[in-house]
């Protein structure tokens, strides 16, 4: 399925790793490094089924993003692919299109398995897959924690083409034999870096052992830490590599500013001063702990500011309702943590506030990547205390960007 290696050829791990690093460091002007050279400027040129094209255009895509121009076709050809691109570049639609193109719709068995690090992201992928496959009659189900096991078993028994899920619940369904792996021919790891940093490595390995041997593998990730390279080496067969240099991982069109806040205690007043500006548009405010989400929400409400909040301790139903209200625009300001950064795909968000700077530079990308998706303009404002100066410096160096002090006319920027 995945373009098997020639008989008897040994896979040279050291050579592969050194090649991978070379790819990451060559050529300053190329947007992507890839061993697959074809670029398709239009969805119509990709040889996709008519009903898949209908779904793509109905979803609102007009022209493929850079990663879609390179990444959809090799996936459709059954090749193993490693695709590295930042949030908001259309990674999800890339692998969804590749999967939808290859399914046998006459066979109502699970043929593709997609793993994601959080429930929110898994449910987001399920929505995109269902929307793009609307005219194909695709059956998709999200297997995630916090939902009924029995309901999962019922839906899987009734037959689905694609399962999207978090590693824990997917492994559980495989172990119970509620999810049968016999017909699975495509396996995708989305946000692989995040899954590994959350300690899902063993579960991913366990799941892989239960899948058929000749399987197509896609790894999608914003960053490529060594553990992600290790996964590609263990599970992938001569993968096509489509990579973005780290310096280009920041998003175009997002203006980034900082506000000097002398002490942690003064952040709240600073946020309240900005509230009128926040409510003009839709905004997401990031803090670093669940407890702080609750604390900040209470403080804002006690000052008569309308905000909604979501974090990992809330039950799934509550989170779904809050996200629905936010997506529909009935709620304008959302307070949350990194856990949910990757699941918030809200088109209207044009302002992100990092009330707390992220604890590692990589997460900065996933937070501000929520504003200005697909070339939309956006503004990110970072609250910086003396203790945060080092992290601000690290973020600027990591992404090769300059973050300037917030001007007085912030409302004009939105």
Swiss-Prot record:
Could you tell me which InterPro entries the record lists for this protein? DEAD/DEAH_box_helicase_dom, Helicase_ATP-bd, Helicase_C-like, P-loop_NTPase, RNA-helicase_DEAD-box_CS, RNA_helicase_DEAD_Q_motif
Entry's localization field: Cytoplasm; Nucleus
UniProt entry tagged with the keyword Nucleus: yes
Instruction: Name a biological process GO annotation.
Output: cytoplasmic translational initiation
Q: Which residues form the Helicase ATP-binding domain?
A: 72-242
Specify which residues bind ATP according to the UniProt entry for this protein: 85-92
Matching entries from SMART domains are given as: DEXDc, HELICc
- Positions in coiled-coil regions: none
Transmembrane annotation, as ranges: none
Give the GO molecular function terms: ATP binding; ATP hydrolysis activity; RNA binding; RNA helicase activity; translation initiation factor activity
Motif (DEAD box) on chain? 190-193
Domain Helicase C-terminal stretches: 253-414
Write the record's keywords in alphabetical order, separated by commas.
Answer: ATP-binding, Cytoplasm, Helicase, Hydrolase, Initiation factor, Nucleotide-binding, Nucleus, Protein biosynthesis, RNA-binding
Role summary: ATP-dependent RNA helicase which is a subunit of the eIF4F complex involved in cap recognition and is required for mRNA binding to ribosome. In the current model of translation initiation, eIF4A unwinds RNA secondary structures in the 5'-UTR of mRNAs which is necessary to allow efficient binding of the small ribosomal subunit, and subsequent scanning for the initiator codon.
Instruction: Family membership, please give it.
Output: Belongs to the DEAD box helicase family. eIF4A subfamily.
Q: What is the protein's quaternary organization?
A: eIF4F is a multi-subunit complex, the composition of which varies with external and internal environmental conditions. It is composed of at least EIF4A, EIF4E and EIF4G. Interacts with DRM2 (via UBA domains).
Protein name according to UniProt: Eukaryotic initiation factor 4A-3
Q: What is the lineage of its organism?
A: Eukaryota, Viridiplantae, Streptophyta, Embryophyta, Tracheophyta
């Amino acid at each position: 399925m995945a373009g098997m290696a020639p008989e008897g050829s040994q896979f040279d791990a050291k050579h592969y790793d050194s090649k991978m690093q070379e790819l990451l460091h060559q050529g300053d002007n190329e947007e992507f490094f890839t061993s697959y050279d074809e670029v398709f400027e239009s969805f119509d040129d990709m040889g996709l089924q008519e009903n898949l094209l209908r779904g793509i255009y109905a979803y609102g895509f007009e022209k493929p993003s850079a990663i879609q121009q390179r990444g959809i076709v090799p996936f459709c050809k059954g090749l193993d692919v490693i695709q590295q691109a930042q949030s908001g570049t259309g990674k999800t639609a890339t692998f969804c299109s590749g999967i939808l193109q290859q399914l046998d719709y006459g066979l109502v068995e699970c043929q593709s398995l997609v793993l994601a690090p959080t429930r929110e992201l898994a449910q987001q992928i399920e929505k995109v897959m269902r929307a793009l496959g609307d005219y194909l009659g695709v059956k998709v189900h999200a297997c995630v924690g916090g939902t009924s096991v029995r309901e999962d078993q019922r839906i899987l028994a009734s037959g689905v083409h694609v399962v999207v899920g978090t590693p824990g619940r997917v492994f559980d369904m495989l172990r119970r034999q509620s999810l049968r792996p016999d017909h699975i021919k495509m396996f995708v790891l989305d946000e692989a870096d995040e899954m590994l940093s959350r300690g899902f490595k063993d579960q991913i390995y366990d799941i892989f052992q239960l899948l058929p041997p000749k399987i197509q593998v896609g790894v999608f990730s914003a960053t490529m830490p060594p553990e992600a390279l290790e996964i590609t080496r263990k599970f992938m067969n001569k993968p096509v590599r489509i990579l973005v240099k780290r310096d280009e991982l920041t998003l175009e069109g997002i203006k980034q500013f900082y506000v000097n806040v002398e002490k942690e205690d003064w952040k709240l007043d600073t946020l309240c001063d900005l509230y009128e500006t926040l409510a003009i548009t839709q905004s997401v405010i990031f803090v670093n702990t669940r407890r702080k989400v609750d604390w900040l929400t209470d403080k804002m409400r006690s000052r008569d500011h309308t905000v909604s909040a979501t974090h990992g301790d809330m039950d799934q139903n509550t989170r779904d309702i809050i996200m629905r209200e936010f997506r529909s625009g009935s709620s304008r300001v959302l307070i949350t943590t990194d856990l949910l950064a990757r699941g918030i795909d809200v088109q209207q968000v044009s302002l992100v506030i990092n009330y707390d700077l992220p604890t590692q530079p990589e997460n900065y990308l996933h937070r501000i990547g929520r504003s200005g998706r697909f070339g939309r303009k956006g503004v990110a404002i970072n609250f910086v205390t003396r203790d945060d100066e080092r992290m601000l410096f690290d973020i600027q160096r990591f992404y090769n960007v300059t973050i300037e002090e917030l001007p007085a006319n912030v409302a004009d920027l939105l």
